[in-house]
Swiss-Prot record:
Residues 59-68 have a biased composition (Acidic residues). Keywords: Membrane, Transmembrane, Transmembrane helix. The chain crosses the membrane at residues 1868-1888. InterPro entries: GREB1 (IPR028422), GREB1-like_2nd (IPR048659), GREB1-like_C (IPR046927), GREB1-like_cpSF2 (IPR048657), GREB1_N (IPR046926), TAGT (IPR049100). It comes from Homo sapiens (Human). Its main location: membrane. Induction: Estrogen-responsive; regulated by estrogen receptors. Regulated by androgens. The regulatory region of the gene contains 3 estrogen-responsive elements. Disulfide bonds: none annotated. This is Protein GREB1. Residues 1127-1147 have a biased composition (Low complexity). Residues 52-77, 302-334, 1085-1210 are annotated as: Disordered. GO terms for cellular component: extracellular exosome; membrane; nucleoplasm. Expressed in proliferating prostatic tissue and prostate cancer. Residues 1085-1095, 1110-1126, 1166-1178 have a biased composition (Basic and acidic residues).
Amino acid sequence: MGNSYAGQLKTTRFEEVLHNSIEASLRSNNLVPRPIFSQLYLEAEQQLAALEGGSRVDNEEEEEEGEGGLETNGPPNPFQLHPLPEGCCTTDGFCQAGKDLRLVSISNEPMDVPAGFLLVGVKSPSLPDHLLVCAVDKRFLPDDNGHNALLGFSGNCVGCGKKGFCYFTEFSNHINLKLTTQPKKQKHLKYYLVRNAQGTLTKGPLICWKGSEFRSRQIPASTCSSSLFPALESTAAFPSEPVPGTNPSILMGAQQAGPASDHPSLNAAMGPAVFNGKDSPKCQQLAKNNLLALPRPSALGILSNSGPPKKRHKGWSPESPSAPDGGCPQGGGNRAKYESAGMSCVPQVGLVGPASVTFPVVASGEPVSVPDNLLKICKAKPVIFKGHGNFPYLCGNLNDVVVSPLLYTCYQNSQSVSRAYEQYGASAIQPISEEMQLLLTVYYLVQLAADQVPLMEDLEQIFLRSWRESHLTEIRQYQQAPPQPFPPAPSAAAPVTSAQLPWLASLAASSCNDSVHVIECAYSLAEGLSEMFRLLVEGKLAKTNYVVIICACRSAAIDSCIAVTGKYQARILSESLLTPAEYQKEVNYELVTGKVDSLGAFFSTLCPEGDIDILLDKFHQENQGHISSSLAASSVTKAASLDVSGTPVCTSYNLEPHSIRPFQLAVAQKLLSHVCSIADSSTQNLDLGSFEKVDFLICIPPSEVTYQQTLLHVWHSGVLLELGLKKEHMTKQRVEQYVLKLDTEAQTKFKAFLQNSFQNPHTLFVLIHDHAHWDLVSSTVHNLYSQSDPSVGLVDRLLNCREVKEAPNIVTLHVTSFPYALQTQHTLISPYNEIHWPASCSNGVDLYHENKKYFGLSEFIESTLSGHSLPLLRYDSSFEAMVTALGKRFPRLHSAVIRTFVLVQHYAAALMAVSGLPQMKNYTSVETLEITQNLLNSPKQCPCGHGLMVLLRVPCSPLAVVAYERLAHVRARLALEEHFEIILGSPSSGVTVGKHFVKQLRMWQKIEDVEWRPQTYLELEGLPCILIFSGMDPHGESLPRSLRYCDLRLINSSCLVRTALEQELGLAAYFVSNEVPLEKGARNEALESDAEKLSSTDNEDEELGTEGSTSEKRSPMKRERSRSHDSASSSLSSKASGSALGGESSAQPTALPQGEHARSPQPRGPAEEGRAPGEKQRPRASQGPPSAISRHSPGPTPQPDCSLRTGQRSVQVSVTSSCSQLSSSSGSSSSSVAPAAGTWVLQASQCSLTKACRQPPIVFLPKLVYDMVVSTDSSGLPKAASLLPSPSVMWASSFRPLLSKTMTSTEQSLYYRQWTVPRPSHMDYGNRAEGRVDGFHPRRLLLSGPPQIGKTGAYLQFLSVLSRMLVRLTEVDVYDEEEININLREESDWHYLQLSDPWPDLELFKKLPFDYIIHDPKYEDASLICSHYQGIKSEDRGMSRKPEDLYVRRQTARMRLSKYAAYNTYHHCEQCHQYMGFHPRYQLYESTLHAFAFSYSMLGEEIQLHFIIPKSKEHHFVFSQPGGQLESMRLPLVTDKSHEYIKSPTFTPTTGRHEHGLFNLYHAMDGASHLHVLVVKEYEMAIYKKYWPNHIMLVLPSIFNSAGVGAAHFLIKELSYHNLELERNRQEELGIKPQDIWPFIVISDDSCVMWNVVDVNSAGERSREFSWSERNVSLKHIMQHIEAAPDIMHYALLGLRKWSSKTRASEVQEPFSRCHVHNFIILNVDLTQNVQYNQNRFLCDDVDFNLRVHSAGLLLCRFNRFSVMKKQIVVGGHRSFHITSKVSDNSAAVVPAQYICAPDSKHTFLAAPAQLLLEKFLQHHSHLFFPLSLKNHDHPVLSVDCYLNLGSQISVCYVSSRPHSLNISCSDLLFSGLLLYLCDSFVGASFLKKFHFLKGATLCVICQDRSSLRQTVVRLELEDEWQFRLRDEFQTANAREDRPLFFLTGRHI
């Protein structure tokens, strides 16, 4: 029979496979059993079994539930109403009794609503605009997720008061709904009704019936704000069970999955509610929250309901999340916290973790009574986790039990894990079944050690891996194949049936020695819970830690729950459900009510001499007047090395100077780089160019020590001086303006900061949020709690206020060591704006050399696990044993109280033992004794009395006060007040130190101020002290280098989140000297310890007779580590532990192993185990507890290598025998510790600070935390890193990968950004609702780095470099060079003597001689131009520069940009946005391309130019009508007088400077209208147009792409003249004379940045005595002044002096000079019509043009009192031309000597224009052509019609061949050479014969080709006087197609 039908298991195979599976999983380190159950089914019937057994869909999933359960799936029948009673009212909106039920009518009337009922709005088809009011039993209404409504109905009529309607049909008749279909409560009960602040009944949230259409509605804030807070205070608790979905960004519906945008936003002022059964407006107002109305998706989709009729009042689907029940509040059900102020979208994950608030769970069925005195009997409150299905009511002694829904939430999340594969179309992949979930949970609990607590993260990963493995084939199939339109048939989703589950679970639990007990129920969970309570009361579960209750009676589903009954686990779990506020409240209550008195009384019974206080008093009386002999030698008075003055000297005490370390500088530069990248982005979110200076505000947590510490950092960093504050103004009050303590007074100071930022738009304000993870509570929570705690949500209210977010000049920098809570899916900080502290090395190479090495958490763990040294992380086994024992004795006391009292007792006993009461050694632990001995003896090792600091961390402030008072009392009784200080460190108060110690500190730190007091912990350097550090969280306080012990045994070990753990351990972070390796130092410490201590430990092992001692003896390193860390020899033998254990009747054997196993310093990983001989190294499981922990479980299955494990103890030891063994060893232990005391402490006679520099502090941890920290996963990542990152966030999904040790900080950030979401109380919770797609704030950055590593110094350095950069942005490097050749200036009798003339007098100016000498320093290496006035000596010329130094060595000065500066493309400001074409209100300016052609005879062809004209600039041009062809550029009239525009068009030729060219003349022109044209090459047109979209551009023809600046100048001038002619013709038609058209243009370099004017104060008109000053003015001012000159039309060329700080008075004394002009010229194109620029030139074309203009008899005038500043631009310009070889593989540099070659040679040709090669060659090697001219300034080279630079050693004489030209008299000059460059027909033989040459002078003729060369020689009859040789012909090194230039040289006969 049994195996004959489909789906039945094969019994024999089943038992065999299951047995092997369970045994293998128990032996394995892997927590996740292989999914073997799929093997157990007959494959042929797999699908059918799956559909029948595993794919359960409750009938209740269907919404169409009918009256009486008679409905079928067919179409609904028309509903017939029962006949109405005669005489009753039938009016719509009234009941049959005639009472008005309409909401609008009775909204203000009082209503009698029984307990458990809610007022509901009924929708009537006949009254669509009205709601009818009725009262309904809320058990028949759905919970917030649309589930758990009992079938049926129970309601009352609020009109007539009739009660007891049991059928909705009957009720709908009574209220006259008049329906044509069968009444359904889901259809007609539509809204909850709530009362607003005025007490008026109003429509509230939609009732979320499952499957109904979901609508996002919100109650107006005014509706609920008034009564929300009182309800929270009294009864409401926020449920932590969210919608059962994994990803909050996806709204899962029963029939659809909507996008994230459909997610309803949580109303900030509205919270979910829990009812206590009383109907009050306050409760009703909180009735429902729309966010919870998310429909629950079916695991298998919507299936047809073919099941049997439904039974009335049957519960909803067990998949439904439970809603709080009003009738039976569970224990702790009233707890609420900030995290719960809004509804969680995603469940809590940690069974252990903060914010795991306990909430009532919905119940069904018969109630279960909780026995009285359960806590007294069990010694701990059992914690019951709801699992699957329905959970019964609890009643009776509810205070002794805790119920939590967290496990249910975990189950629900893992049920939906397959949704991640929906993108592959994998609807066939089923979630893990409920049966498998429960079985895996049992497996997990079985493998937990006795001292382990279950973690939800572990369980989630087990489910995930099991699911992955069981569906690996399907997953791969869908990942590799495209989505299929029709998915295959479902595979088996539940290989284990509910009927088999209890037996399988019992079988799995059978091997764990009853640690896990399984109870099977026949009917309901109530039966199993009652059974569990009975067993607990009878003491039959004394050895049981977990009870699994399973009810599999229902055909398609299971009910389950898990109760934690182990005393250790239950205590930790129940305490972890308390919020921090509740935790403090609980401790306060126990202290205030005197509950702890029993604990104190117990301690007083331990001492054999009686109460410790009596012993202290006795000791005090005996030793009054003198100090104990053991401490008589004061550390200060002992013999020591003295300095000259007789003061003791200590070489180890040197306070480190405040200096910036390489790491900090690197981080500061990274921060600066990120700020610059924000500014450089196209989003225009930060305009660095508009800021002139930096200001800042540092916001810190409300800690006085942190506040003072930050003030000191700011003071010593010098940042305020860097920001411009004068040294004399540096006062403490001034520094305090920059640091804001976020307390109740912060708002005023912050408002002043905002006001300051608003008033100073040109100041960049950096808002630094230090310790940014501290307060992340949303300001909406403040709205709820503002009356009770005004500081709630303060950070959000200040730093996230609208003013900060919108201010364009505020950058917010969050700084934290624990950034995880700021890295969620809703974060405001872009991942690109995160800056992580850099790693110290890469690939083994130090990136930044530092003399100190940072020692943080990872280094602590690494050193502890490595085994190379004494462990720095330790736990105190005897302390933990004592706490565990006392926890059982005092179950009603919080463990924090017990731990604090035990630790204080240990410290007191240790102090007494060290002070001369050796018998007290038995009442402390070795760890505490070590701390105390080193604390008291360290001052003896130093001549100055320097000692060490002991940090005692007591998070709970009231307990810290208790500890302080007790230790101070003991210290006073022992007369140790001057030996060490006890400091109570509290965030709210500063540092208080006794006068004696203040005096010592002043002496050590050489402080003369008698009023000085230490205000930070850093100032306690070297002070022997115990710092009792209180506060729930550290607030960024730094600790001194003298910190030697970090005692964290009292931290809240139940609060297992990553931030909390790392924050506490961060207190020990340290910088150690890089000079001494840590391991070496640690080994030295091991050598200092005494051998007797080690032997006593081994002897102890032999005494206890364990096999582990043999392996421990074999491994010296392990013995050493055991000695360093364990307290077995003394603490386990202490009478305190003995009596605590002995007096505990129900003490479990696990108490002993808990203390005994701790003899090993930590659970050993495989690397450590492998070091013991004979041990086999096994890989650590990637998930789950470390092997040492699993070894501690009671009665483990025997394993082969059990005997070889270090520290293994026999678990089966009776309490009596253990006590007797411990007692018997007390004598030997006390004697063994006594001699050890002298050698345990610091041995060498050296200051403790010497050792402190070499080694980090030793950290003592609670055992639970220790195990969490040192256990690692397969990648080596500490398990603590995988915990929930912060209490204010939640995991977004169970379906998430694990963190890996190989992840960088950036990868971890991306991980948290993907897998965490903020809780509703988190300030980022509502970020995605702001409508922005990305949600990132553009000016917000995050700096993260390990604690105590120097982040404060880094961001202060960042402020400094940012300030420097802003100053640098407002500064430019301008050329600052003295004019050259001043001593060669023409010394003529003629000077321009009218010093005060604003414009030159034409007649006077004409008489001035032209100064041929070039004075512009950029031409320092140019050939000197000679005239007959000069007598030049060779020494008058300075040393020429090397060619490569020409640019590098030019002198510059840094100048602050004025408001009249020209800018490049990086400048942005509001004023010139429109000018630039980037204004946000405008689109990029449209431009049109216009061709403009004109003929030029010299070029022999028509020139066609192109104008790019933006639409906004078309008014400057004339276009033909109607064709729109460009005709001309408009020119003003000479007679126009306007101060609003500049008449002269400005042309700026440019190349290679599209970003850096100074083309933004808006500010330079002071906003005046002007015409500015950029002249660009064709190939650069697009890039210039991109950067300057609103500028007119003149595009040169493509033939000029490789031309030099001469071509641009040539075309500008010719175009301008041609345009002048066109305008004259056009305006002549309008009656305007041609001479009235303005003929001037400006040709400006693209590097002109600012313009200046010289103000001269002279004593008289002709006096040479005067004073002058120079100031910056606008270009508009200069241009309008020059354009207003009366005789300006007579000048051909005007220019300005080049600015120099070295300008002499003589240079500005004369206002005008007739000389060369450069850089910025004003050209009269009319007068210079016949003078052209040379279009071929690259260099010196302006000098050449100046000489041409002068020789044509035209006037050049330089305004000496105007100057132009030229910016140094390192890109573009003439540097754009690179001379390279045409042979691509020739990488050798080309030198100028290679620029020419012999014709027809095999020379390598160059890729450069021939003209450039010519000019460059002549500049560097012209002496080869003119050897006689070298340094021969009396005999220059004659240069005809051109000026070419022949180098600084050769002088030239320029003459023009044009008729009537002005030339110098050359009759008395003998020339050393003749240069004929492309001579035209004006040069003839007769012209050359006028000049005389030295014998041997050389000639150089340059022509376009060889034939022209010969023709020129013949035409000029050169062979008459010059000798030519064939070898004297050359060409530029160009290929033939590049048209080389040809040279011919000759020698004068």
